[in-house]
Amino acid sequence: MIAWLDPHDPFPPVDRALGPESEAPGLLAASAELSPQRLLIAYRQGIFPWYAQGQPVLWWSTDPRMVLRPEDFRVSTTFRKTLRRVLDDPAWEIRIDHAFRETMVACATTARPGQHGTWITEDVIQAYTALHRRGYAHSVETWHAGQRVGGLYGVALGRMFYGESMFAHRTDASKIALAALCAFLGGQGVAMIDCQQETEHLASLGGAPVPRAAFLAHVREAASAPAIVPWHFDKSVLRRWTVRNEQA
């Protein structure tokens, strides 16, 4: 039995989340509302929302937790060639926070194999856009010839980044944005990107599961660190990161 949260109710302890033997491992609580303040409280406690359209807001704390350390991002030989083209061709741009809401909409509407519908409803977009206006939510966008062709968004607290979703309208466009994010965050002292749930795709990019207790210990320290200011990106950041990756 999970807890139902009224607007001012605190989250239950995360060790009350449903266990691996249940049909919904990691499910902790449900609520009717998704406010910006509730989101900030959740992320600081290692809790994230994920639900289908028409359901109440479902709150999760999975164990283990999928994370990506920026230095562990895997760059294949083929993708390394792609990054070189992006770096050398001025038609390719990496922008941060240029089109946050539009990036969320693209994440919601881009078709994905095996996925029907989206949890990124208009209410979700409004809540995260409010966080963006307050400096907590950010987008990393891949542009080509003036067109946004891929990107991702997530939430930053201190030196902790919580990835939410990504999209691509061109091959590797979301992967380029993720590489740029890793390059930027690595340079800012961010040691861990929260990827929430384990998938084969994330594992192929270098993501790995960690025990929830270890994840929460890291969140408590990293999320209380000074915020990253400013969020600014140019290709030199990605170029230096790519060179270091080649030498590793």
From Swiss-Prot:
Its EC number is 2.3.2.6. Pfam families: Leu_Phe_trans. It comes from the Bacteria. It is found in: Cytoplasm. GO terms for biological process: protein catabolic process. GO terms for molecular function: leucyl-tRNA--protein transferase activity. SUPFAM superfamilies: Acyl-CoA N-acyltransferases (Nat). Keywords: Acyltransferase, Cytoplasm, Transferase. Its main location: cytoplasm. GO terms for cellular component: cytoplasm. It is an enzyme of class 2 (transferase). It catalyses: N-terminal L-lysyl-[protein] + L-leucyl-tRNA(Leu) = N-terminal L-leucyl-L-lysyl-[protein] + tRNA(Leu) + H(+); N-terminal L-arginyl-[protein] + L-leucyl-tRNA(Leu) = N-terminal L-leucyl-L-arginyl-[protein] + tRNA(Leu) + H(+); L-phenylalanyl-tRNA(Phe) + an N-terminal L-alpha-aminoacyl-[protein] = an N-terminal L-phenylalanyl-L-alpha-aminoacyl-[protein] + tRNA(Phe). The keyword Acyltransferase applies. InterPro entries: Acyl_CoA_acyltransferase (IPR016181), Leu/Phe-tRNA_Trfase (IPR004616), Leu/Phe-tRNA_Trfase_C (IPR042203), Leu/Phe-tRNA_Trfase_N (IPR042221). Belongs to the L/F-transferase family. Functions in the N-end rule pathway of protein degradation where it conjugates Leu, Phe and, less efficiently, Met from aminoacyl-tRNAs to the N-termini of proteins containing an N-terminal arginine or lysine. This is Leucyl/phenylalanyl-tRNA--protein transferase.
